[in-house]
Structure formats: structure tokens, C-alpha cells
Curated annotation (Swiss-Prot):
Highest taxon of source: Bacteria
Gene Ontology CC entries for this record: ribonucleoprotein complex; ribosome
Identification of the protein by name: Small ribosomal subunit protein uS11
Coiled coil: none
GO molecular function: rRNA binding; structural constituent of ribosome
Role description: Located on the platform of the 30S subunit, it bridges several disparate RNA helices of the 16S rRNA. Forms part of the Shine-Dalgarno cleft in the 70S ribosome.
HAMAP family listed in its UniProt record: Ribosomal_uS11
Species whose genome carries this gene: Ehrlichia canis (strain Jake)
Pfam family, one: Ribosomal_S11
Gene Ontology biological process terms from the UniProt entry: translation
Amino acid sequence: MSVVYKKKKRNVVVGVVYIHATYNNIIVTVTDQQGHSLICTSAGACSFKGSKKATPYAAQETASHAVKTVVEQNGMKTVSIKVSGPGAGREAAIRAVQACNLNVTSIKDTTKLPHNGCKLPGRRRV
């Protein structure tokens, strides 16, 4: 007979929502203050496929799904938001987190910008 281990539910009141928006997808990760991941989801995991993953609607649905799951399981009440990437769903994901009745303490843009680093790839020739 096999033994099934159930993950212990932790009561996490304060957390961090990381939103990584690229041109092709959006990834939302919710962690506690120490950085331990509570849930990680993407637009592809929320049944958006192909070019629909890069839309603001997909970002909104992905962010709201992640936050609602954490609120139900862990009782989170306060979050800070960290956004990175140049994608189209940045603002929609932030609004979706704010609409989930959470106290948002800060919104920070952590997009990395090169100070003239590597050479960009050449333009596509079709």
C-alpha cells in the first residue's frame, strides 16, 4: 500500500507577486516574503495557446487565477508586485491583482536594461 503525503497548508498573510511578461507569454509567480514559491502559473497553463498567450486578456486571467488560488489556500491579504519584461500584458496583470481585494503595498518594475551590452540579432529577411 502506498503512502500519500499531503503538503501542509501554510498561513501566509504577506507575499510577493512576480509578473514576467514577454512578447510570447506571461508567467505569474506568487511567493512568501522569504521567496518560497506558493504557486507559479503561465498563460499556456491557463489554456491559452499560440499567439493568444501574449494578449492582455490572457495576462489578466493568469494573474487572477494565481492570486485567487493563493488567497483560498493560504489566506493572503497583502502583496507587493514586481513586474519585469516588455510584454503587452503588464498593466492588465497588475489591474487583475488589484481587483482581487488584496492590499497592494508597492509596484516595482524590475526589467533589466542593457547599458549597450550584446549586439542584437539581425533583422528578419523573408
